[in-house]
């Protein structure tokens, strides 16, 4: 019996084949020409370069992590393209042409040559149609009139991806890559004891990215875009890069920490068995920029605490995979503050918890309102991260936060919602007080 295969490419290089067995299992095999190539690198650090079939769970988990987390979105993909199932192979058969990182998946009978960029420019009305497609049960902005527009964007939020050419937003054709992730408002999330109003998530994330950049963290550029009544966040993809002549858009290999550790997305949170700070810091010891990456990762943990970012799980940290299998940390992404949803029918500040715990005198500390500088210092000590560097990170935040908040506020567009600014700023300054008292900074 002939088993169905998907050929995996990185840019115009054939990497290997993904096979779905009769029992539904997924196997992967690197192509001999890829193993011999000077560009060779593992598809994932959980799938080392080797000859023969790889049959470990890491194969299924790697490809599954390329897909949206939401079962609802996956069902929409099945419905839109008549996919055979919600299994990674069957979904990626339909939407694997432009995935996260450098992965392109196409059927055996298709070939990839040196890519010729092709796209369709969107009018404002057409852009609005793409951005509101999810309301009509259409996944990832893949509207019915565009059968050639097939992308896969991981994550839990409603989003799509588009190509930016000059000032125009475009739908890519064929295997032309996208340049931006377009994120839609999350809306309301109903929980047993609260309703979380994230209808302003676009503004929230934009604000957090600006503040992160102002404080020296490596984050992607982003802008708020509008089409008709739609307000969305366009985030520049750091897994894409134009060639020198700006004629070809290259895909850059990367993977998230669930893929790195060979884990399913269902355990992306430390509380569910996923990696925490200690595991990721140990992994970053092997980075090609280990000292910088470990410093930046610890700095980002403090930033998440200050802004009340509760979603810093394993899928929200990634590494670039370089030739030969070396790796380094990517920019930080998917940053949103929980402070604007406090109060009313929302949640109490005592309910806010970091996704990855800090070391305390007894066990782990995750409750944001119970965390103090000493918990970061205790964590650094356990990790053998230099105490002087941890003090430097904390004291720098103590010194920089007030001016950074002012600078971000003055740079915001005039129609930016004041309640988002007030909620984040008030709580950041309250937690900042713990730093300023510790380091004697007024």
Show which residues each predicted segment covers.
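Phosphate/dinucleotide-binding and metal-coordinating scaffold of catalytic cores
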Residues: 1-314, 318-442
């Amino acid at each position: 019996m002939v088993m169905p295969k998907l050929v995996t490419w990185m840019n115009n290089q054939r990497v290997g084949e993904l096979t779905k067995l009769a029992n539904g299992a997924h196997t992967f095999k690197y192509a001999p020409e890829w193993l011999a190539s000077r560009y060779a690198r593992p598809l994932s650090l959980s799938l080392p370069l080797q000859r023969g079939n790889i049959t470990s769970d890491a194969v299924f988990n790697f490809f599954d992590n390329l897909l949206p987390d939401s079962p609802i979105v996956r069902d929409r993909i099945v419905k839109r393209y008549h996919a055979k199932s919600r299994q990674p192979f069957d979904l990626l058969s339909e939407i694997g042409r432009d995935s996260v990182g450098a992965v392109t998946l196409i059927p055996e009978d298709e070939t990839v040559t040196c890519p010729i960029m092709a796209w369709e420019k969107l009018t404002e009305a057409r852009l609005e149609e793409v951005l509101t497609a999810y309301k009509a049960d259409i996944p990832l902005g893949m509207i019915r009139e565009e059968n050639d527009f097939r992308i896969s964007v991981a994550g839990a939020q409603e989003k799509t991806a588009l190509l930016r050419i000059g000032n125009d937003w475009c739908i890519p054709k064929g295997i032309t890559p996208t340049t931006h992730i377009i994120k839609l408002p999350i809306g309301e999330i109903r929980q047993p004891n609260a309703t979380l109003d994230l209808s302003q998530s676009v503004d929230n994330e934009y604000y957090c990215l600006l503040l992160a950049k102002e404080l020296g963290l490596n984050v992607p550029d982003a802008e708020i875009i509008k089409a008709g009544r739609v307000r969305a966040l366009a985030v520049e993809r750091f897994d894409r890069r134009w060639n020198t002549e700006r004629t070809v858009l290259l895909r850059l290999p990367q993977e998230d920490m669930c893929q790195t550790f060979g884990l399913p997305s269902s355990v992306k949170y430390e509380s569910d068995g996923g990696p925490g700070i200690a595991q990721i810091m140990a992994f970053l010891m092997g980075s090609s920029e280990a000292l910088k990456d470990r410093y930046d990762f610890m700095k980002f943990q403090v930033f998440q605490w200050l802004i009340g970012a509760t979603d810093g799980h394993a899928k929200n940290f990634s590494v670039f995979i370089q030739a030969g299998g070396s790796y380094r940390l990517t920019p930080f992404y998917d940053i949103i503050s929980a402070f604007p949803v406090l109060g009313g029918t929302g949640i109490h500040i005592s309910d806010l918890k970091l996704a990855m715990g800090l070391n305390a005198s007894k066990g782990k500390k995750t409750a944001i309102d119970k965390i103090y500088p000493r918990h970061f210092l205790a964590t650094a000590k356990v990790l053998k991260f230099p105490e002087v560097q941890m003090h430097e990170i904390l004291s720098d935040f103590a010194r920089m936060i007030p001016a950074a908040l002012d600078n971000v506020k003055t740079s915001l567009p005039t129609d930016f919602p004041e309640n988002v600014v007030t909620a984040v700023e008030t709580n950041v300054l309250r937690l900042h007080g713990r730093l300023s008292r510790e380091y004697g900074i007024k």
